[in-house]
Amino acid sequence: MTKKVILILISIFLLCGCNKETIEVEEKTETRKDYYPEAVTDIYDEYVPMLNTVTKLTYFEEEYSKVLLDGINDVLIKYHKLLDNYHYYRDDNDDLIKNIKYLNDYYGNEDGLDVSDELIDILSNMKKLMKLTEGYFNPFIGELIESYGSKFSNFPVVCEDIDTDLIDKYLNETVDYNDIDKIVEIDGNHVVFHKYKDIDKLSINLGAFSKGYVAERVMEYLSNSKETILLNEGTSTIVGHSDINRTWNVGIRDPHNKYSYIFALELSNNSSLSTSGSDQNYYLLDDGTVRCHILNPYTGYSENYYSIVTVLSESAMVSDVLSTALFSIEDSELSIDIIKAVENEYNVNVDVCYVSEYDNDELIVRTTLDRDKLLNKSTSILSTEVMDK
């Protein structure tokens, strides 16, 4: 097996429930190249960053193929346009693309609309994962997230929470995962986004899903290629492809020191890693309580059970969704039940690492991985507990 060690320090932020970040400070190589896909243009000729974040492809010069990179770029553009809930786009025939934003406009319209096979697949997986995570992945809390406005920041300040009455209002309008089939009804390629209760405005936001879903589509495109590619989306959802079983070591960032890491994990061929954390994009209360961007759909606030949650799986979509959902769950039995349900449904293996803070900046790690899978562990780790699945 050929191993190319790439050290990626993962920091995390989540904007509107979705965006996450990783900083790469890797061992340099003369042949390594980075490719950044171009921004996408909406119907008003405004530039939109690919997947609304920084997307990077790492490849090796000896294996360079412009045709391959162009093909990957086409896949990224196609699914960015479908998953975007903020912008309209046109296709090659100058027709409006029926994407998530287009579907949101049909909320409460009982006639529904016909959509592409690709959007049907997106919606079907959305519904399935909402049920499997028992609503901790909830793509209908966009209004709640937006009610926080600009409080979340990479340069946090002391703020007051938003009004509790406003949070209660949005919680009362939160979609119950048991009702998802009644709200988003799929019949072949026909979709009806039914009105829920008496809620005037309801929209789908797939920020905690989209990067992983797109990464899987890219891996499908690469399935028969011989090139080695590392796809880094928003620099938290990371997947690797290699025809020669090249592996990468991915360092999980220390929440107290953005230039250091607490341990590294091996990312094998065609596997994925996704991380969520509270150490960026947050604000502080007067008493020092951290309010981060990852909101619990059942309380309307962020939780402080963990500093970091990292999920590894063959499915980038699963890793992306679970890293967000598990962040808000303290009950380890419920977390394991959800992991098992997802594993059984998607026929994948899922492992998780929880990092919690202790006194004096010491960290406690709980993981379903064997201890020897945590590489280059930091001295800031007080203890490591292996969890049974």
Feature-to-residue mapping (PLM):
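Mature catalytic core of soluble alpha/beta enzymes
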Residues: 2, 18-389
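Sec-dependent bacterial lipoprotein signal peptides
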Residues: 1-16
